[in-house]
A protein has these predicted regions:
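Catalytic phosphate/metal-binding cores of nucleic-acid and nucleotide-processing enzymes, i.e., regions
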Residues: 1-111
Length: 111
């Protein structure tokens, strides 16, 4: 069963997620960071951008990318359920950029 980390201060994952997943719900930047630090990467991360606090889903995505850089890991699968279109695109761009960097490193290391 895939492990899914749901980041959202408002939405309940059971209202949105279809399928058989082991879901962990976190509602803040601090909870997100603690989950990743304690458990490593899940198989899938679902991001909200606006968390109703100082830190946003984008900050969580930056933490995740830094974690991946430090541990030489690719990003997990991800989705973004935020209604904030600018925040959504910022998260998507950050995550996709790290995936491209990681994939390029793998290719260079093989040569």
């Amino acid at each position: 069963m895939k492990k899914l980390l749901w980041l959202d201060d408002f939405r309940n994952p059971s209202d949105y997620v279809v399928g058989d997943y082991d879901i962990s719900l976190v509602k803040s930047y601090a909870e997100f960071c603690k989950f990743i630090t304690d458990n490593g990467l899940p198989d899938i991360v679902c991001f909200d951008h606006d968390l109703g606090e100082e830190k946003s889903g984008y900050d969580c995505a930056k933490f995740l990318v830094n974690y991946c850089q430090e541990h030489n890991l690719d990003i997990p699968e991800f989705d973004i359920q935020s209604t904030n279109s600018v925040g959504k695109e910022n998260i998507r761009s950050l995550m996709n950029n790290w995936h491209r960097v990681y994939s390029t490193r793998l290719l260079l290391d093989k040569n």
